[in-house]
């Protein structure tokens, strides 16, 4: 009696749903060893990422992100098949730490080669790009002592170190530009917005290592609704004491109209968001104006238990109308510097 009860509890019969067709299996590196012995290549990035689809966990989510991004790219083909004549608009959002890191060069590649149409970033995502043109950022350690670093004029971003002299160079570089912008505002009636301000910085830096430079060259707008929340805000603050008869004025309302108009006029919309916070919400909310995006890829390490926007999965945005109910969507949980270069290698750069 006891044995029968226990067996009934343990050996419950399975009823496999019809949609469970993919068996879990990892990459067989032996196969690629044999190919190398025959004079061929080892495993390629595309083959590795394809194998992720059957590994499970976040590997499968990364595979799905690659699949979704490649579908976005297919809809951006300049000569698409007739059934895909509605060209997709791709929105890219990223946080400032990614520009501080070597992900900057990955992002620059996307902008240089016109892989995306609209960008949203934070103030740091703007200023750190310029600052890197003026002085290097170094790899340090997460555990360096903050008090000692401060005494040496070294700023820590995770395990990255930015000499404070770089920000001094930034001030020297940007102040003459702010002077010219104020002059144009007062004498020519130039109406500045955060995005036109960023575009001007891209023009002035004139450096091919810069994301902003390529955005200027390729006419890709960069929006930053929290532009004053960083070193740029410090510079604007200091400049108010020198500007006459009035300081530089940036019209954020004009930018929200332009940002939302990109979404409203998009035939189809895909969003790629690296990190969370303002960049994530700004892009998603713009897509609300068109009843949601058709494709969505989130990559961040935040969880949803605290109700944060950063932690929210794409399905939460579906409830708000920011992503369509039938959209292709995925969230990859992980750190962007580890994941995004691999994703780009399997999509835009393949």
From Swiss-Prot:
Binding-site residues for NAD(+), renumbered to this chain: 96-100, 122-124, 128, 229, 276, 301-302, 335-336
Binding site for spermidine: 127-128, 234, 281, 307-309, 316-322
Top-rank lineage group of the source organism: Eukaryota
Biological-process GO terms, alphabetical: regulation of cytoplasmic translation; spermidine metabolic process
Swiss-Prot/TrEMBL cofactor(s): NAD(+)
Cysteine pairs bridged by disulfides in the record: none
Keyword Transferase among record annotations: yes
Active site: 322 (nucleophile)
Annotated coiled-coil segments of the chain: none
Cited function: Catalyzes the NAD-dependent oxidative cleavage of spermidine and the subsequent transfer of the butylamine moiety of spermidine to the epsilon-amino group of a specific lysine residue of the eIF-5A precursor protein to form the intermediate deoxyhypusine residue.
Protein name: Probable deoxyhypusine synthase
Lineage of producing organism: Eukaryota, Fungi, Dikarya, Ascomycota, Taphrinomycotina
């Amino acid at each position: 009696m006891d044995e029968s009860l226990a067996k009934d509890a343990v050996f419950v019969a399975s009823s496999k749903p019809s949609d469970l067709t993919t068996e879990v299996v990892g990459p067989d590196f032996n196969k690629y060893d044999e190919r190398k012995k025959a004079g061929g290549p080892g495993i390629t990035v595309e083959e590795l990422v394809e194998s992720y689809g059957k590994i499970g966990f976040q590997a499968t989510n990364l595979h799905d992100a690659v699949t979704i991004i490649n579908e976005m790219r297919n809809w951006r083909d300049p000569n698409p098949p007739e059934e895909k004549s509605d060209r997709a608009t791709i929105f890219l959002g990223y946080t400032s730490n990614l520009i501080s890191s070597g992900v900057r060069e990955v992002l620059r590649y996307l902008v240089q080669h016109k892989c995306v149409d609209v960008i949203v970033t934070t103030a740091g995502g703007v200023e750190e790009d310029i600052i890197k043109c003026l002085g290097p950022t170094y790899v340090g350690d997460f555990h360096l002592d903050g008090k000692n670093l401060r005494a040496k004029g070294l700023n820590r971003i995770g395990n990255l170190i930015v000499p404070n002299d770089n920000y001094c160079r930034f001030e020297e570089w940007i102040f003459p530009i702010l002077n010219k912008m104020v002059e144009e505002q007062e004498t020519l009636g130039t109406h500045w917005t955060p995005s036109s301000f960023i575009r001007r910085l891209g023009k002035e830096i004139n450096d091919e290592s810069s994301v902003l430079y390529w955005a200027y060259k390729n006419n890709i707008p960069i929006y930053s609704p929290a532009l004053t929340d960083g070193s740029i805000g410090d510079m604007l603050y200091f400049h108010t004491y020198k500007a006459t008869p009035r300081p530089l004025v940036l019209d954020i309302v004009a930018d929200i109209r332009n940002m939302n108009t990109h979404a409203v006029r998009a035939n189809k919309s895909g969003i790629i968001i690296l990190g969370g916070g303002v960049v994530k919400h700004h892009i998603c909310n713009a897509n609300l104006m068109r009843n949601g995006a058709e494709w969505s890829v989130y990559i961040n390490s935040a969880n949803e238990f605290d109700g944060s926007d950063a932690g929210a999965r794409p399905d939460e945005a579906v409830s708000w109308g920011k992503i369509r109910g039938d959209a292709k969507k995925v969230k990859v949980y992980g750190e962007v510097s580890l994941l995004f270069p691999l994703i780009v290698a399997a999509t835009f750069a393949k």
